[in-house]
C-alpha cells in the first residue's frame, strides 16, 4: 500500500527541473555551492595514475568521482567560472512590472483584514500575490489553500476572533504539493485529493528543529475532509470533515496556479541557456588562466633538483658570481 509520504510519479519526475530553476534564480553563490551538480568536472579531474613495474607502463585509472588532486583542480576550475544571474534578474523585472501599479482590491467587510494579514503570518494580500507570481515563473505548478478551522453552527464573529478561527490564504510551492487527484462527481471533474508536505518547528529548550508533516485534503463521499500525518506516515489528526458554520463543504478549497505549457516552467529555456553559459565560461576562463603563464621548455638538462615554476618565484644560483 502506498504511504502518504510517497509522492506522485509526475512530481518526482519534474522535481529536478524545479531545483535547477531555483538555483539559477538564487544566483552564482547557490549554483557554485552545488558543485558538480551544475558544473561537471573534466575527465582528468577524475583520473589518477599508477605505475606497472612488470610492464614498465603508467596506467591511467578512471574514478567515479573527483580524485584528491582532481578536487583541488576542480575548485580552481569552478572559481574561474562565471554565472550571470540572468534568470533571477528577469523574474524580478517581470514581477516588478506586474505589480508596478496597485491592484484594485474590493473585499467584503468581514474579510477585509486579508489586505493586511492574508496568511496569519503578517503578510499582506499584495505580498502573498507577489510570492505566488514569482513562484509561477520558477515552477510549473504551485497552489493556494483557503484554510479555515472548523466552526460550529451559530459561531459569532467574536468567537471567530477569540478562538483564531479566521479564514486565511496559504501559498504552497511545488515541492510541497506531493500528490493530487481528480474525480468526476455529478458529471463534473473535481479535485478529490491533495497531499501537502509542510514543515513545522519543534522547540526543545533553546534548540529549534524542523520536522515534516503531511496534510491530506480529500473528498470522502463528496464531503471535504482533512487529516494530518507525521514524517514517518503515522496518523496524528484523525480524518474529520471540515465544518463551516455548521455546514459541510463539497469541494476542496485548493487552487492550482499553472502557467505556460503543461509541466514546464516558462523560465526553463532561459535557465538552460544560463547554465550553458556557465559551463562554457568555466572552460574558456580556465583556458585563459593557464595559457596566460609563461611555458618553460628546457633542453639538455641533466637530472637534478626540481625547480618551482610560476609567478612570485626566484631562482637562486649557488655560484658566487651569480647576478640578478
Where do the model's predicted regions map?
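A short linear-motif detector with a strong N-terminal bias
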Residues: 121-125, 171-174, 273-276
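Extended, regular secondary-structure scaffolds
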Residues: 136-257
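Tryptophan-centered short beta-strand motifs
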Residues: 57, 66, 224, 235-237, ...
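Intrinsically disordered, low-complexity boundary segments flanking structured domains
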Residues: 25, 125-134, 162-167, 176-184, ...
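Charged, low-complexity, helix-prone segments enriched in Lys/Glu/Asp/Gln
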Residues: 18-35, 84-90, 128-138, 215-218, ...
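Extended, helix-rich architectural segments
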Residues: 1-169
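Extended, charged amphipathic alpha-helical segments
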Residues: 234-324
